[in-house]
């Protein structure tokens, strides 16, 4: 298959809207593979970045699954071939590279940050993996520095028990995925319940919501000797109520080793050590996927293709998506 010169891509227009437009394909760098996108998945980052840091002309989207159609000059060292089914994530709404994003017919991806799709998994399922796996790796094993032994991947590799918060209707789901216990984050006693359940031994907290209420739950749940708190967004300073707890937040797109010229606190310099970690983490993640130890997120496959995606982003912005990931088929499987 010879890729065309033009493609459909979902971009931020000069009027500030999100629209499907005709656009050139991304230029392929030496270490990259060109993937024909079959399915994409939406993430909160897609909605937040487009709203808070929109870049005119940028291609949106991070999560994708598709088939390799071209290789860069140095990408053959990674044992990928034309026609391989792959998935992963890229830096969508990237001010450094307007021509590349997952919400397009073709996406350019570093070969060492790409995952091979196992035979038992379809494109819709695979499209949900990239951002979630990248965020888990950057959060737990890079920022919080939990121990990770590659040979134990898929077998409680960190030696820690996972306690989670969610809505009660998702309790069975998270427990089926390995959570030791689940608590209702709507409850005013949620933090205290977790602290009692863990006998005051909770040391690490990862806050996927990041507001004053979720931060208060995490701080109350952490044991009396203190611990470490990590959020997926900049945390409210007024929520830092315990000196014994060390707070931080993670921006996973630093793993691409590119400067991020957004406004503070999102502005970052290039970070080569984050890229090196990501390379090693994706190798571990691939082994876990191959062993069947990674289950794709519950997906909700929506209709509408490219034109339906803006509506899905609105659902995320309104907080109307719970316990599932919105997926769109954008090409025939």
UniProtKB/Swiss-Prot annotation:
EC number: 1.-.-.-
GO molecular function, one term: oxidoreductase activity, acting on NAD(P)H
Pathway: Secondary metabolite biosynthesis
SUPFAM superfamilies associated with the record: GroES-like, NAD(P)-binding Rossmann-fold domains
InterPro entries registered for this protein in UniProt: ADH-like_N, GroES-like_sf, NAD(P)-bd_dom_sf, PKS_ER, Trans-enoyl_RdTase-like
Binding residue positions for substrate: 131-138, 252-256
Pfam family, one: ADH_N
Organism superkingdom: Eukaryota
Induction pattern: Expression is positively regulated by the aspyridones cluster specific transcription regulator apdR.
Membrane-spanning segments: none
Residues annotated as binding NADP(+): 45-48, 167-170, 185, 232-233, 321-322
Top-tier EC class: oxidoreductase
Keyword Protease set for record: no
Keywords: NADP, Nucleotide-binding, Oxidoreductase
Entry keyword NADP: yes
Similarity comment text for this entry: Belongs to the zinc-containing alcohol dehydrogenase family.
Task of the protein: Trans-enoyl reductase; part of the gene cluster that mediates the biosynthesis of aspyridones. The polyketide-amino acid backbone preaspyridone A is first assembled by the PKS-NRPS hybrid apdA. The assembly of preaspyridone A is initiated by loading of malonyl-CoA onto apdA, followed by decarboxylation to yield the acetyl starter unit. The growing polyketide chain then elongates into a tetraketide. The adpA PKS module catalyzes three Claisen condensations, as well as beta-keto processing and methylation.
Subunit structure: Monomer.
Protein name (database record): Trans-enoyl reductase apdC
Annotated source species: Emericella nidulans (strain FGSC A4 / ATCC 38163 / CBS 112.46 / NRRL 194 / M139)
């Amino acid at each position: 298959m010879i890729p065309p010169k033009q493609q459909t891509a979902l971009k931020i227009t000069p009027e500030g809207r999100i629209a499907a437009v005709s656009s050139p394909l991304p230029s392929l760098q030496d270490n990259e593979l060109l993937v024909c996108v079959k399915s994409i998945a939406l993430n909160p980052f897609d909605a937040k970045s487009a709203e808070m840091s929109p870049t005119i002309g940028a291609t949106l989207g991070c999560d994708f699954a598709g088939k390799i159609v071209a290789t860069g000059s140095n990408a053959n060292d990674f044992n990928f071939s034309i026609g391989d089914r792959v998935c992963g994530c890229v830096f969508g709404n990237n001010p450094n590279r307007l021509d590349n994003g997952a919400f397009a017919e073709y996406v350019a991806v570093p070969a060492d940050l790409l995952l091979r799709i196992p035979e038992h998994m379809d494109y819709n399922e695979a499209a949900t993996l990239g951002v979630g796996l990248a965020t888990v790796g950057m959060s737990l094993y890079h920022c919080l520095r939990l121990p990770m032994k590659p040979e134990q991947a898929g077998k409680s590799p960190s030696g820690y028990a996972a306690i989670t918060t969610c809505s009660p209707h998702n309790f069975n789901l998270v427990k089926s995925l390995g959570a030791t216990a689940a608590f209702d984050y709507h409850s005013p006693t949620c933090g205290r319940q977790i602290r009692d359940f863990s006998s005051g031994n909770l040391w690490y907290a990862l806050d996927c919501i990041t507001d004053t209420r979720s931060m208060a739950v995490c701080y109350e749940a952490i044991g009396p000797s203190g611990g470490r708190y990590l959020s997926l967004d900049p945390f409210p300073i007024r929520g830092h109520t315990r000196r014994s707890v060390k707070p931080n937040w993670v921006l996973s797109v630093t793993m691409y080793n590119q400067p991020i010229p957004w406004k503070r606190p999102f502005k970052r310099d290039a970070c080569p050590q984050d890229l090196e970690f990501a390379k090693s983490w994706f190798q571990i993640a691939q082994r876990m996927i191959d062993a069947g130890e990674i289950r794709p997120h519950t997906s909700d496959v929506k209709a509408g293709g490219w034109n339906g995606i803006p509506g899905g982003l609105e659902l995320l912005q309104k907080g109307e998506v719970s316990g599932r990931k919105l997926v769109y088929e954008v090409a025939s499987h």
